[in-house]
Design a protein with these regions (language model features):
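Generic secondary-structure transition motif, activating predominantly at the C-termini of alpha-helices
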Residues: 18, 80, 84, 103, ...
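C-terminal/domain-edge helix-coil "capping" segments
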Residues: 22-53, 72, 112, 124-143, ...
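Positively charged n-region of N-terminal signal peptides that target proteins for export
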Residues: 1-4
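N-terminal segment of the mature soluble domain
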Residues: 54-142, 146
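Bacterial N-terminal signal peptides
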Residues: 8-20
Length: 206
């Protein structure tokens, strides 16, 4: 994942909000509202890594952009299916297959511009994204879409890795953003930090 001034600015935008409100627990995934439904999970398209990790061997395996996105998709999908099995999650690999079969009617799930949903100012889906998601959900007779909008890694003051996520659920028909959460967690490795951040919004006692 490239570390440039642009990445640094994205990190600042993504991480500032959770850091400002750590006393408030992140909003949990609304599992009870989604139970029994087919819910597509869009691929993540933005992973920002603090430039401070440039020479850190801990991040050596996360420097290839596509591989890092695939890893993040896998971790998110695993957490959703293991911790919220009552929802019929339609994960990125299947979404891509469905989109390929409906080429010309459905946009590529990796190129819908979903990272823009990390902005807390958005209350409605932008028109083009709304149209893309409406077409996508029609393939599975769904309505609600789960969007991992962005993932950021930074160095915690105690030296651990800090993972911060921007997660959104939206109604593809009405265009309304129904839920937003900004979980954050620390861990000895990027994988451990991300796993803990996901667990924060997927508590087992919901």
């Amino acid at each position: 994942v490239p570390r440039t001034p642009i990445v640094t600015s994205i990190l600042a935008l993504l991480l500032a909000l959770p850091l400002a409100g750590q006393a408030v627990p992140p909003a949990p995934v609304p599992i009870h509202s989604l139970g029994g439904q087919d819910v597509p999970v869009l691929p993540i398209t933005l992973v920002a890594i603090d430039p401070a990790f440039d020479s850190d061997t801990l991040f050596a395996s996360y420097r290839e952009h596509r591989a890092t996105l695939t890893w993040a998709d896998s971790a998110i999908g695993r957490a959703l299916t293991e911790r919220a099995p009552e929802v019929k999650w339609v994960l990125p690999p299947r979404l891509r297959k469905l989109a390929r079969r409906a080429a010309g009617l459905v946009d590529d799930p990796d190129e819908m511009g979903q990272a823009m949903l990390r902005s807390p100012k958005l209350k409605e889906l932008p028109d083009q994204l709304k149209a893309s998601l409406r077409n996508l959900t029609a393939l599975i007779n769904g309505r609600i879409v789960f969007v991992p909008a962005a993932l950021g890694f930074s160095r915690d003051p105690d030296g651990q890795v800090r993972a911060e996520l921007s997660l959104v659920a939206a109604d593809a028909r009405s265009g309304r953003i129904l839920w937003r959460s900004l979980p954050a967690a620390v861990g000895a490795t990027p994988s451990a930090a991300l796993t803990s951040a996901l667990a924060a919004v997927l508590p087992q006692d919901q």
